[in-house]
Design a protein with these regions (language model features):
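A conserved acidic beta->alpha catalytic loop
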Residues: 43-54, 104
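Short beta-strand/loop segment that forms part of the nucleotide-sugar
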Residues: 35-46, 72-74
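Hydrophobic helical membrane-anchoring modules
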Residues: 1-4, 11, 184-247
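Donor nucleotide-sugar binding loop of glycosyltransferases
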Residues: 15-19, 46, 80, 104
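Acceptor/aglycone-binding surface of glycosyltransferases and processive sugar-polymer synthases
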Residues: 74-78, 82-91, 96, 108-178, ...
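Short, well-formed alpha-helical segments that are part of the catalytic scaffolds
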Residues: 15-30
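Short hydrophobic beta-strand elements that form part
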Residues: 7-11, 40-41
Length: 247
């Protein structure tokens, strides 16, 4: 597929300062390693003052990085999934659709490498980063987040049958045709789960690539959001096709 036909969305909620630190190395890494990938920041209901400040900073960066698009925003917090879908709607011609978290926990080089891998693929597939210490990658996580992630992913394996060690890593890339074939419902953090479940139902391979990761303070995944994620997983099991359980 044409390298230029890739759109990377960065959903951001109260994350402007870390995002502005992340954008220059990200833009440079994409130019050097993944062709002309368009980058679309979507601000998911951050305070108005932050939205104005961030829009001005992005406008300045666009002078050096034309692939960085004007910022999108809306006044109310609607959730990560809603922000991603809002951004993806801006490029109906893109062959590949990607997203990455705004905090810069995923190194820019890892984002570029995964996008380049997808662009070089001979067959459609979902590509996602996974954070695992069982590789030569450097993964630094806060202890409570590490334990919570293990518990959640084990529960997802049992409840939804998704055989992945890390469903919630904020770096994923999917083919546009796959995205266009479904009506998407999850607006929050459960968008990742919906994506993987729909890929399984469609028979689309999922390629998991170990990545380096460095946890950043100030995560927006609160205990309330985690409970909502468990509730969404229950809802998804009721509403989406499940794999066969026997012969």
């Amino acid at each position: 597929m044409n390298q230029a036909d890739t759109l990377l969305v960065i959903p951001s909620y109260r994350d402007g300062k870390r995002l502005i630190e992340f954008l220059p190395p990200l833009c440079a890494a994409l130019i050097a390693n993944a062709g002309q990938v368009r980058i679309q920041v979507v601000v998911d209901g951050s305070p108005e003052s932050e939205q104005h400040w961030l829009a001005a900073k992005i406008a300045e960066l666009r002078g050096d990085y034309p692939s960085l698009q004007p910022m999108q925003s809306y006044p109310q917090n609607r959730g990560k999934g809603h922000a991603i879908r809002t951004g993806w709607a801006t490029a109906p011609q893109a062959a590949w659709l990607a997203f990455v978290d705004a905090d810069g926990a995923t190194p820019a080089a890892e984002v570029a490498a995964l996008i380049a891998q997808a662009q070089a693929a001979q067959q459609p597939a979902v590509f996602m980063g996974v954070r695992t210490a069982a590789t030569n990658k450097s993964v630094t996580r806060f202890w409570h987040r590490r334990i919570g992630s293990r518990v959640f992913n084990r529960w997802v394996q049992l409840w939804l049958g998704l055989k992945f060690t890390d469903t919630q890593c904020g770096l994923k890339i999917i083919p546009r045709a796959f995205y266009a074939s479904s009506v998407w419902r999850e607006a929050g953090f459960a968008f990742d789960l919906e994506l993987l479940l729909r890929a399984r139902a469609a028979g689309l391979p999922v390629i998991a690539r170990p990545i380096s990761w460095c946890e950043r303070p100030g995560s927006s995944l609160s205990p309330t959001a985690m409970l909502a994620l468990f509730a969404a997983a229950y809802r998804l099991r009721q509403n989406l096709p499940q794999p066969p359980t026997g012969p």
